Amino acid sequence: MEIGENKILETNDFDIAKSKQYHLSLRIGIDNFSFSILDTVTLSYNYLVVNYFTYISIKDTVKKITSIIKNNNLFQLNFSSSSLIYSGFPNTLLPKELENSTNEKKLLEFNDDKCYEKIYFDIIDNIKIIYSIPETVDNITKTFFPTCKTMSEEKIFLEKKIYRDLSTCV
């Protein structure tokens, strides 16, 4: 693997001509943007880019992420699939039974003093994860990655925890 100045890892097997057999995974946070490329045939990660930056404002974060996307030709490729994780944004958990009786925005504000304009949720078994992201960050997703499957980072953590607990019970 070759390591570059911008925290880039690339295997010798990486070939942009094979983009149709690759899955693009993205992660957007308040102070970071990273992505990796998985070869769905060999099930190996062939490319990884990690960008951390000092948080100044949402506007500045969006500007930095947009610049990274626009200046990387990999985002012009056609991938077999793509997914995006929102990381570190305000979130809370709610039992699924209560989902229709509660104002999601008020719940988020109760749990975290920040609540952004866009409110989304993920469901895992009987748990509802409610999270919010800034509208400008949401616009990045819709503009550059309109077909991306999106979810909160907490969903992945909880799924792994639930799966691990279930596998130890068997």
Report each predicted region and the residues it spans.
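Generic structural motif
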Residues: 31, 40, 56, 87-89
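Short N-terminal helix-initiation segments at or just after the protein's N-terminus
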Residues: 20-31, 64-66, 70, 110-119
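A short linear-motif detector with a strong N-terminal bias
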Residues: 2-6, 13-16, 60-65, 107-110, ...
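Active-site neighborhood for divalent-cation/phosphate handling
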Residues: 48-53, 70-71, 75-166
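Gly/Thr-rich phosphate-binding beta-strand-loop-beta motif of the actin/hexokinase/Hsp70
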Residues: 2-45, 160-170
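Nucleic-acid-processing active sites and adjacent nucleic-acid-binding tracks
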Residues: 46-68
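Generic, low-specificity signal for short hydrophobic/alpha-helical stretches with a mild N-terminal bias
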Residues: 8, 17, 47, 66, ...
